[in-house]
């Protein structure tokens, strides 16, 4: 019974955090910029593959070239995702400290673990939204490429999701040790 209440509390905290996250323009702006960056990279790499085909070159390992190759779209995402995640995680706990609502949370029957897991769960959902943006381009590629390598792309997406979660955990930690959002973002 007690575990069930902790899970309900964690889900309630995650829902509140997701609502506040998506009411702010920062989460939407990061999502749009992330999608734009992926779209530009994908259009360039996919266009190169089409030009090679038009010039009569034999195409091989198209999935590798588009997604994980030297000019693929997953390596730049891995290099730049650390710029996006701190913008979201910087306010997870810092907002609570600045507004003074952290005192209310500590005095309520909500446990610290439920607060932290709820905030991390909201970042898991946001990370899934980022991966869903990438999934649109993966779906387009799966439809247009004849021998699409699903295992390569899905394992790359899983790795990217886990990287987002690792950065989210670091950002949540940095946000919990300082009440200033800028310090939390720079520390992440």
Predicted regions and their residues:
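Secretory targeting signals
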Residues: 38-43, 61-79, 118-183
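Central hydrophobic cores of alpha-helical transmembrane segments
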Residues: 31-34, 184-188
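Hydrophobic alpha-helical transmembrane segments
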Residues: 1-84, 88-91
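Transmembrane helix boundary and interhelical loop/hinge segments in multi-pass membrane proteins
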Residues: 87-106, 120
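Perimembrane helix-loop junctions in membrane proteins
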Residues: 45-55, 95, 99, 146, ...
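Alpha-helix N-cap/helix-start motif at helix boundaries, enriched for small hydrophobics
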Residues: 113-117
